Amino acid sequence: MSQCCCLSPQEERLQGTKKVNRQGRERVYKILDRIQFTVPHVDIERARYFTESMRQTEGELLTLRWAKALKNVAEKMTVYITPDQLLAGRVGQLGRYGILYPEIDGDFYIEVMKDLPNREKSPFQIDPTDMQILMEEIAPYWEGKTYHEHLNKVLPAEIRGVTYHDERGLKSKFVVSETSSYRSALQWVPDYEKAMKRGFIDIQNEAKAKLAGLDLTNSVDIWEKKPFLEAMIIVCDAIMIWAKRHAQLARDTAAATSDPVRKQELLRMADICEHVPAYPARNFREAVQCQWFVQMFSRIEQKASAIISNGRMDQYLYPYYKKDIEEGTLTSEEAKELLECMWVDMAQFIDLYINPTGNEFQEGYAHWEAVTVGGQTPEGEDATNELSYLFLESKREFPMTYPDLAVRIHSRTPDRFLYEIALTVQDGSGFPKLINDEEVVPLNAIKGCPINEALDYAISGCTETRMPNRDTYTSGCVYINFATALEMLMNNGRLHYYGDELIGLETGDPTRFQTWEEFYEAYKAQHINLLQKAFQQQHIVDRLRPQHFAAPLSSVLHNLCMKNMQDLHSEKIEGGVDYSYFEFLGYATVVDSLAAIKKLVFEEKRLTMREVLDAMNANFVGYEPIQEMLKNAPCYGNNDPYADSIAKDVDRFTQVEAEKSSRDRGIHVDVRYVPITSHVPFGKIIAATPNGRVAGFPLADGSSASHGADHNGPTAVLLSNYHSKNYGMINRASRLLNIKLSPKCVAGEQGAKKIMSIIRTWCDLKLWHLQFNIVNRDTLLAAQKDPNSYRNLIVRVAGYSAYFCDMSPDLQNDIIDRTEHADL
């Protein structure tokens, strides 16, 4: 085991100097011990029964077909109750599992499925009989019908050329990467509170009343609204049928058990499942079970980017918690145990990416169902309550990768709550991530969201926010590798990785640029060319998706969908906010490279462009002095106005183009800096860059500094983020910011106060997102050498935490190479 002078609590647990307290958690640890670190398996039932129904309903409105398919799945798929569990509702076999969505990527099955058990990243087992059913029954139906095939067919050649690396579109080019062919929707947050307060019988009655009020002489009412409302009625039946089947299973299991304690647990489970989600929840246990049914049935409905988030759990569960505590029918420990039963079942659902690109972008069995706590009420008051603290306690006491815990921070966040956040950060497992109300709320309001709803946002995905009854944009986004713009500028429109293929603009021989202004204008031309191709790609994506996807459950829980009688996947829903976005990949890599060229070539003339090109073409072998000069040029992340001003201008003209696309496409387009793990594969196709980075090395992630380039401490990193933002522009959104700290610098009471201070500074600067890794480099290196001794090591990756040993060596090295700040 690693021997470090100061360990985080997580590291102490790993080394045995601090024991894991299982007392009071015997139930959840029994479940966890059975499934943790097992290789997940593929469950085909969702795909099988969904396909069976879709085969029978061709020609009907897609939303209606989808609802009928969900009902078929609800009636036929096997239901399970995990031994020792207090909650019912899973969508696959016992153990860790993933499910399939052939409507998205069934055309990949023949090429990809056979390799699932042996692939390097996130392998899955599959039963041979299931494989046969998949290939003989399921895949043939979807041939020629999948969304991916349609998109690949209609993309113009010049857009395909930056999107896919092969004719079939199986592999991304990693230049302008669409994400819509491996997910049917972006991350989503259902309106759980509506289901809890009203129940699906009442929601269904609303649809029936609307149906009865239609004008059946009106063509729109007959052909669009009528089948939509019929779909809403059917999907309400579907989720209630599914719940009732769990109730019956619980009764049958109770009858067969000899353990009197377990028998009573199962009988109570049966009673709860017969009541919710059909009727309003009456207590905390019913509210939690209702939430879990909605969350898991949402997974049957669609592949929402691995993320059906939990929403503001401390808000919508609190009335039930408070009532039960006051009446003496629930203790805080019982509430915690019930929630941890949810966490441990959540950990068993593993998002399965058949698409090779999706698997590259979501390493480490990534999925992140964020629990949002803290923040403000719709009236603008501090929203912290007893449950907010309980979620933080659970994360410290029962450390797991699931759920992702996200805390909303504002200028009036209580010191006591901030202290508990600091203690959780100190633990070292990367939780919680922080989202800043002072940036998010006014920005969403300016973009058109009513202020009370902007104040009530939930965190969804890595750093995204959702307003469950106002958001209507579900389409996939695009990841743009702007380091390719830099390389194409230095290589006349070409990338070394792809040989002589012309991918960008032919901007000429870079040695002929006489001034920085000429060079920078040529860079902007390459950059904007990528943006324009990305916007064209996404325009096509947005037009195709309503032909392939529907979401009746999400729609019936969405006020605007019910008001307008439109499916959530409709192209435009009146009253909704459409926040489209694209991801900026390689921000600090580009900025540092531009700063080095400007400083060393054009201003100080210490290097010629030819010398820089020769050094890069040799991957700096034999040119180490030049590499050091480039590395020592001004770098983003150090509160250096030289680099930060370039960063701000790059962000500025990128937002200008986003605003133009917003006008052209009739939706709001934002620039975001959230890579997940895509900066690793994106970096593999990029040759050496002018900031001294070697070929194939990962790009800088999010809005963080380049690895090893931030020398002036975390406050300087925050200030660079602040100075590089264009606060006067509104085509901006989330910026993912990783900061890695040594455990020693944040140890003890003083360390907690330091964390509180840096969070307050971050909040005052109105930055969007912040998350910490607090782990010794020696621990990470030891885990690479001896993974079996470090199976429980959790680290922060992008907007999620994952087990370090579940990652590829490339991603592990990316985390190791992040700058570790030893002082605050």
UniProtKB/Swiss-Prot annotation:
For the ligand ((2S)-3-sulfopropanediol), the binding residues are: R183, Q187, C462, E464, R672
Family, per entry: Belongs to the glycyl radical enzyme (GRE) family.
Reactions this protein catalyses: (2S)-3-sulfopropanediol = hydroxyacetone + sulfite + H(+)
EC no. given is 4.4.1.41
As for what it does, the entry says: Involved in the degradation of the organosulfur compound 2(S)-dihydroxypropanesulfonate (DHPS). Catalyzes the radical-mediated C-S bond cleavage of DHPS to form sulfite and hydroxyacetone. Can also catalyze isethionate desulfonation, but with much lower efficiency.
Q: Which residues carry this modification: Glycine radical?
A: G799
UniProt protein name: (2S)-3-sulfopropanediol sulfolyase
* Residues annotated as domain PFL: 26-694
Look up the record and name the pathway of this protein.
Organosulfur degradation; alkanesulfonate degradation
Keywords in alphabetical order: Lyase, Organic radical
Q: Does the keyword Lyase apply?
A: yes
Matching SUPFAM superfamilies? PFL-like glycyl radical enzymes
Pfam families xref list: Gly_radical, PFL-like
What region holds the Glycine radical domain? 701-824
The gene coding this protein: hpsG
Which cellular components does GO assign to this protein? cytosol
Identify the Gene3D superfamilies for this entry: 3.20.70.20
- Posttranslational modification: Requires the activating protein HpsH to generate the key active site glycyl radical on Gly-799 that is involved in catalysis.
CDD domains, A to Z: PFL2_DhaB_BssA (cd01677)
InterPro entries recorded:
Form_AcTrfase_GR_CS, Gly_radical, GRE, PFL_dom
Q: Provide a Gene Ontology MF annotation, just one.
A: lyase activity
Biological process (GO) annotations held by this record are: alkanesulfonate catabolic process
- Species for this entry: Bilophila wadsworthia (strain 3_1_6)
Query: Where do the catalytic residues lie?
Result: C462, E464
Q: Which domain of life is it from?
A: Bacteria
Family annotation (PANTHER family): DEHYDRATASE YBIW-RELATED, FORMATE ACETYLTRANSFERASE 3-RELATED
What phylogenetic lineage does the species belong to?
Bacteria, Pseudomonadati, Thermodesulfobacteriota, Desulfovibrionia, Desulfovibrionales
